[in-house]
């Protein structure tokens, strides 16, 4: 079996940039956030900043905090047949981490991406995603995701990359790390 890496971090810390770097190195990516966005669309709900968090919370309430992890493991296993490394973008909760750790055991790593709140808000304003809003929305997302255990995931990550500079700096450090795997 290959290696599964899950990237975690607060909104706009740089998880997507990390995923892009790995993808450019031939590593397939599966996004937990994409699963929530697909659920919103499947339910025919208009996209708005609070909707994504509400649906993610609702899914967890209806099916357990680990619902997204269980839904994703088969797709990742399928990718591992032909790929030595697969990335899961957007690990947010301790229940999800437990599912992944139990499923892939020693072949599972957590990477945290960190950035200061002010910089994350600048990024939110520039990327114009439907789940992004104003500073208050970002703070609500931070609090909601902390409630799922995100801060624990970040503090207990196997490796942490600070993302306070530019994309070239992050890419250089991440690529150097990838070359050690």
What positions do the PLM features span?
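Short, well-ordered beta-strand core segments
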Residues: 29, 110, 159-162
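P-loop (Walker A) phosphate-binding loop of NTP-binding proteins
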Residues: 10, 22
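Walker A/P-loop
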Residues: 16
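ATP-dependent small-molecule kinase phosphotransfer cores
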Residues: 28-87, 91-99
């Amino acid at each position: 079996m290959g290696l599964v890496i899950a990237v975690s971090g607060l909104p706009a810390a740089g998880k997507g940039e990390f995923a892009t770097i790995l993808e450019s190195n031939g590593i397939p990516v599966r996004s937990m956030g994409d699963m929530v966005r697909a659920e919103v669309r499947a339910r025919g709900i208009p996209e708005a900043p609070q909707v994504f968090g509400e649906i993610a919370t609702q899914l967890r309430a209806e099916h357990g905090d680990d619902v997204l992890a269980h839904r994703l493991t088969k797709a990742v296993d399928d990718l591992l047949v032909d790929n030595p490394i697969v990335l899961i973008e957007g690990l947010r909760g301790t229940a999800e981490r437990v599912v992944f750790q139990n499923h892939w055991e020693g072949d599972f790593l957590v990477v945290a991406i960190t950035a200061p709140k002010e910089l994350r808000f600048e990024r939110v304003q520039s990327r114009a995603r439907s789940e992004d809003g104003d500073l208050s929305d970002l703070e609500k997302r931070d609090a909601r995701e902390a409630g799922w255990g995100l801060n624990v995931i970040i503090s207990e990550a196997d490796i942490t990359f600070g993302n306070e500079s530019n994309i070239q700096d992050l890419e250089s450090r991440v690529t150097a790390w990838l070359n050690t795997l």
